[in-house]
């Protein structure tokens, strides 16, 4: 076995909401949608393989976490006029936030041996470490008006 790899994704999603009927044909709905994702990637390529022997074995460990959420506030209004006319209006206000964290550790030229691979990534003599964080936010407004005559 020349390669040892672990590649695992975990996700946790939810959608929490409430709907409230209001007077005069109005209805309010709120949605909260969080998402949590974490990712583990570990890879080792053994020095016993002829292609990687010159690197003395090489390993990588990567960890990523993502947390996103969004909130929707929705107001709806429905009204019928006589038997032929129907009007519906929908208004939406949205807010969202996303955060992402990533750390990568790599190494090669293991001494005296690369037998522990990514389990002892510090045993290599050519380390490389990097990290990246991302933060984003957004908001939105939307409106929709619908008219129907005789349900057409």
Give names to the regions the model predicted:
Residues 1-43, 60-80, 88, 130-152:
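Outer-membrane beta-barrel transmembrane strands
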Residues 85:
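Histidine-centered active-site/metal-ligand motif
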Residues 92-99:
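Glycine-rich, aromatic-flanked loop segments that form ligand/cofactor-binding clefts
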